[in-house]
């Protein structure tokens, strides 16, 4: 399985607009949003805004970086 990330701007009605689509074999499996400075010490981390398929309905974790997010996604969709 090939995982890919595509940068996007996400309309969140908040300062957290920097986003990333997570694709598995060219299928959308998740939307991640980078937390803004208003989140204090969590600023710069990535939040699972929404998951699809096997990621739908799971707890919405916060990842230190995209590598950590990639590992988490790969474990759950394989």
Regions found by a protein language model. Give the residues of each.
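Negatively charged, low-complexity tracts enriched in Asp/Glu with abundant Ser/Thr
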Residues: 1-27, 55
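Acidic/proline-rich low-complexity IDRs
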Residues: 2, 20, 31-34, 47, ...
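Intrinsic disorder/low-complexity signal
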Residues: 10, 15-17, 48, 64-67
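Compositionally biased, intrinsically disordered low-complexity segments
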Residues: 11-13, 25, 32, 65, ...
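Short aromatic-glycine-(Arg/Gly/Cys) micro-motifs in beta-strand/loop hairpins
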Residues: 30-58, 76-78
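A short, charged, amphipathic alpha-helix used as a generic interaction element across diverse proteins
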Residues: 61-78
């Amino acid at each position: 399985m090939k995982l890919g990330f595509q940068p996007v701007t996400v309309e969140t009605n908040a300062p957290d607009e920097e986003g990333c689509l997570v694709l598995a074999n060219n299928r959308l499996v998740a939307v991640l949003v980078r937390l803004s400075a208003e989140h204090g010490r969590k600023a710069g981390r990535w939040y699972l805004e929404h998951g699809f398929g096997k990621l739908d309905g799971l707890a919405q974790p916060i990842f230190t970086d995209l590598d950590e997010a990639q590992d988490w996604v790969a474990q759950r969709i394989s």
